[in-house]
Regions:
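Non-heme di-metal
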Residues: 1-248
Length: 248
């Protein structure tokens, strides 16, 4: 068995190529100069994803075993509150950008029905609410990726109000990823658990990359990075990739 802390850090390092590949795709979307309607749709998708994150974390709280450390429950509740605040912040950002109220009753059900572009779907697919290892990996991989993505948006949006809001979200997501790493280092204390975590992490990364491709511009160079590092069996959909030179 590996030392749990070292094992978790190895999983974290194995995420970095994935994170970088997806950052390239998100930056390409913003650098392609999308019109305000495309930005609005993109922000709505991200807003609803935050609400979905809130729902999944609260399920973990409700379904936590009776012997769960109160500190762990407090940490999950802090994350849930952050997700609720992100939901509100992105709604405010959309209304600020469009200068009109957002009808949640109209947009939320449509986005919740979308199965192809939400990172929060990973939580549903891998039974995070009932699987402590899956939940820790979700925090570390999905929330870790989210921190990078929100930071890319904060760095590329020229409006200071939007940039500040998204930088705050990025910082919160970094904290959530840290919670996942701490949690996993405590519970991955057998060879069997570590093997399971390693296999599950690979599945989560694959799902997350394909969701990212569906929700952004699938970039040729990002796909090449993924296939070079993780293998060419990663791409589960036939995305028509775009070379970076077409964006820049």
């Amino acid at each position: 068995m590996r030392d749990p802390v070292e094992f978790v850090e190895e999983i974290w390092e194995d995420n970095q190529v994935l994170f970088k590949a997806m950052q390239i795709q998100i930056k390409a979307f913003y650098d392609s100069k999308p019109n305000i309607e495309k930005l609005r749709r993109n922000f709505i998708r991200r807003m609803v994803n935050e609400r979905m994150n809130l729902n999944e974390i609260m399920k973990s709280v409700v379904n936590s075993p009776d012997d769960t450390d109160p500190i762990e429950i407090m940490s999950l509740c802090k994350q849930a509150l952050d997700e609720a605040n992100h939901y509100r912040m992105v709604k405010d950002a959309i209304e600020y950008m469009t200068n009109e109220p957002l009808d949640l009753a109209e947009v939320v059900p449509t986005e919740l029905a979308d199965l192809t572009t939400k990172g929060a779907r990973v939580a549903e697919r891998f039974n995070v609410e009932h699987d402590p290892i899956a939940r820790g990996l979700y925090q570390m991989i999905v929330e870790g990726n989210a921190s990078c993505n929100w930071q890319v948006m904060a760095d590329n949006l020229t409006d200071p109000v939007l940039s500040f809001s998204y930088a705050k979200i990025a910082a919160d997501e970094r904290f959530h990823a840290k919670l996942g790493r701490i949690h996993l280092a405590k519970i991955l204390d057998t060879e069997e658990k570590q093997q399971y975590a390693s296999e599950l992490a690979t599945k989560m990364r694959k799902d997350l990359f394909n969701l990212n491709c569906a929700g952004n511009i699938p970039i040729k160079e990002s796909r090449e990075m993924i296939e070079s590092y993780y293998g060419d069996d990663w791409i589960t959909a036939d995305f028509n990739t775009v070379p970076l030179k077409k964006i820049y």
